[in-house]
Amino acid sequence: MILWKRLFHNICIDKMKALFPIKKEYVKKIFDGSKAYEYRKFFCSLEVDTIVIYESRGKGLVVGEFEIADRLCDTPRNIWERTKGYAGISESDFFSYFEGRDKACAYVVGNVNVFLKPKTLQDYGINVVPQNFCYIR
């Protein structure tokens, strides 16, 4: 019975997207392929399969999105060792971000879609920039 519910749930529930504010310098690196990981202190729902990118400290617009290819979670040291080749962030900035944490999370960037015409938050019904992320459909 549980297996059936899980299977039914996966078929019938649309996958969600999450909107992440990401600094302009990191957005550029995601788009040019030099940043293959988006680091966070915790994951959003497993139902999310796409990250929508709000460029903070830049245009202040939604400029693209990427599919989540995988999720990694481990100690900050292990995540850094595994991802440093395409981190797109300095080692000191990485460890500063995760200071005092025993867990680091990383979204593996999959297919990237750069919007030809950037969108506003209002296009998604959002009036305030989320601090970490917000769910959208």
PLM regions: where:
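Contiguous surface segments at macromolecular interaction interfaces
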Residues: 9-43, 47, 58-63, 71-137
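Non-catalytic, usually N-terminal nucleic-acid engagement modules in DNA/RNA processing proteins
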Residues: 52
